[in-house]
A protein has these predicted regions:
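C-terminal edge-of-domain segments
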Residues: 84-125
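Charge-rich, low-complexity amphipathic helices
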Residues: 53-61, 99
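Proteins with a high burden of low-complexity, intrinsically disordered sequence enriched in S/T/G/P/A and R
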Residues: 42-46, 58, 80, 96
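Conserved mixed alpha/beta catalytic, RNA-binding, or beta-rich assembly cores of soluble enzyme
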Residues: 2-54, 65-72, 115-125
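Short, low-complexity, polar/charged sequence segments that are solvent-exposed and flexible
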Residues: 31-36, 79-84, 108-110
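A generic local secondary-structure boundary/capping motif
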Residues: 2-3, 49-52, 78, 103-112
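A structural-propensity feature for long, helix-poor, extended segments
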Residues: 58-65, 75-77
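Short, low-complexity, polybasic intrinsically disordered segments
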Residues: 69-85
Length: 125
């Protein structure tokens, strides 16, 4: 059986990535890095033939794992994707909050938390 996110007819690929913010405790920064990591080494040269309407018809579903106690600016996550329609950005508790073992106020640190986010990015139509 094949599944698809709500509003999708077909999923063409699903990729995962991870991103981190070692200084500043910004989960949004970690999340956008995770999304870029998920898509940055992919190329779909035949997208115009695979997706009805080409890039304009492409749909993107994002699922993030963010450490407990941190929030994400979903609009900033949407801005990562240069093509297609981001139909949803789901955020679950997950990822990792660990320690960088140093606090650098000049980097925006408010402690030594090191935030790691995971992302699953699905592309289809």
């Amino acid at each position: 059986r094949v599944f698809a996110p709500p509003g999708f007819t077909r999923v063409l690929f699903a990729e995962c990535g991870f991103g981190a913010d070692q200084h500043g405790q910004r989960a949004t920064k970690a999340a956008t890095r995770a999304c870029r990591n998920a898509i940055e080494f992919n190329s779909i040269p035949s997208i115009r033939e695979l997706v009805p309407g080409g890039y304009a018809g492409m749909k993107i579903h994002v699922h993030l794992g963010i450490p407990e106690g941190f929030d994400v600016d979903v609009e900033k996550v949407r801005e990562v994707f240069p093509y297609g329609e981001v139909t949803s950005v789901d955020v679950d508790r997950g990822g990792v909050k660990t320690r960088s073992w140093i606090e650098l106020p000049a980097q925006g640190d408010d402690g030594d938390d090191f935030i790691i986010c995971v992302a699953n990015v699905s592309v289809g139509y």
